[in-house]
């Protein structure tokens, strides 16, 4: 958090002092096809596909499902960056996200709804973090006001696209 604050302040200082066109972005959780399975949504999707293909027992291993995060399709994030390049104000910091935090449990439920097989869920203690912020949610009013940008891809569509990516990759 401290490094992010310092980075933002440096951007503002350089923008003013050297008349540089600098726009700072605080991007929240990106999700989308081809994302590494080191990230929760892609991990759950990959596990689901492995189970569907009988390459894994029908159990998804999870960590904390109560945490709420602001997930946004990476394709919407790219559109946000493009909008900021065209209409963002130099020296300003913009939050880029969906503006809506949803629980990891809700994400998992959406993934399991799209699965072709019955899957159980088990907690793996090694996936639990010693400290987890309960809710992280972006206030996107500034980027919307300044550029007109809002995310347009529905979470269920993103999940479908991620599942399709893993279904193709794990042939």
What residue spans do the PLM features occupy?
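Rossmann-like NAD(H)/NADP(H) cofactor-binding core
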Residues: 21-26, 94
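Active-site Tyr-X1-5-Lys
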Residues: 1-23, 45-52
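PAPS/PAP-binding and catalytic site of the sulfotransferase fold
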Residues: 40, 44, 103-115, 158-162
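Non-catalytic, hydrophobic alpha-helical segments
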Residues: 77, 81, 96, 107, ...
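Amphipathic terminal alpha-helices
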Residues: 155-171
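Residue-level signal for the nucleotide or nucleotide-sugar donor/cofactor binding architecture
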Residues: 2, 35, 39, 69-75, ...
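Glycine/proline-rich active-site loop of Rossmann-fold NAD(P)-dependent oxidoreductases
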Residues: 5, 30-46, 53-58, 74-75, ...
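C-terminal "lid/loop" region of Rossmann-like NAD(P)-dependent oxidoreductases
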Residues: 59-60, 64, 91-94, 102-109, ...
């Amino acid at each position: 958090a401290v490094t992010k604050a310092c980075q933002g302040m440096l951007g503002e200082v350089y923008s003013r002092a050297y008349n540089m066109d600098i726009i700072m972005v605080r991007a929240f959780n990106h999700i989308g096809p081809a994302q590494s399975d080191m990230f929760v949504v892609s991990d759950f999707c990959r596990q689901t596909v492995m189970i569907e293909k009988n390459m894994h027992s029908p159990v998804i291993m999870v960590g904390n499902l109560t945490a709420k995060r602001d997930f946004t399709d990476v394709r919407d994030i790219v559109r946000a960056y493009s909008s900021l390049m065209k209409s963002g104000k130099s020296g300003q910091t913009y939050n880029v996200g969906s503006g809506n935090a949803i629980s990891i449990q809700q994400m998992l439920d959406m993934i399991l709804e799209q699965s072709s097989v019955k899957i159980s869920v088990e907690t793996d203690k090694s996936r639990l973090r010693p400290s987890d912020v309960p809710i992280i949610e972006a206030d996107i009013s500034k980027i919307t006001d300044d550029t007109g940008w809002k995310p347009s891809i529905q979470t269920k569509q993103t999940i479908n696209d991620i599942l399709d990516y893993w279904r193709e990759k794990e042939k």
